Amino acid sequence: ISEPKQGMATSDNNRFLKFWHEVDFVNIGFNFLNTKDAYDSNLKWFPYNKGGEFRRWYGNQEYVVNWKNDGQEIKKFREYKNATLSSNMGVAGLSDIFKESITWSFVSSSNFGVRYSPNGFLFDVGGSSIFPDKKDIKYLTSFLCSNVTLVFLRIFSPTINFQAGDLKLLPIIFSQSDSNSIKQSIEILTQENIDISKEEWDSRETSWDFTKNELLKHLVPKGTL
């Protein structure tokens, strides 16, 4: 259906990663669809999936990565490290950056859950991702958020790490017919869950899509709660 991909390691997160609110907001490139448009924008920072705490459906969108000029600084730093320290660093998954995806946290103490990620993100080794066809992404998201998936992953990976290779082993029933009513019902429910999770995430001031405190939404006309 789709190949789980391990994300990149910058080799120096303190240098190349920032919380989105630590940088100039107008210098963040949101919603880019491909590397060419991102390069032509001359922007420096781009959304970055880095895993984070256990959360299903949507969220954990906190970081941006320095990907100006198609990651020029990161790539040069990698070359320097490889030459001076004989390290084997890599910038993986570049063919899929900025694509709509499903992402998850590499480390989790007890639970597993994936999150829908819209276009515009790069991704970390701690936030590995899957890039299915658009027509399958909601259905696959629901399966990966199910208890069935958790049971299988606890068998495949008894540790606290959920690697891309573990997800490759998951069995899934997948209809080839787009008119399948069960699949359509699942996709509708999945979208509802994503919408609910997004609304909750964006109600926090730590979200870059935050607009208004939840308490203010309940003010009566006279300005009291």
Q: Which residues does each PLM region occupy?
A:
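S-adenosyl-L-methionine
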Residues: 1-58, 62-225
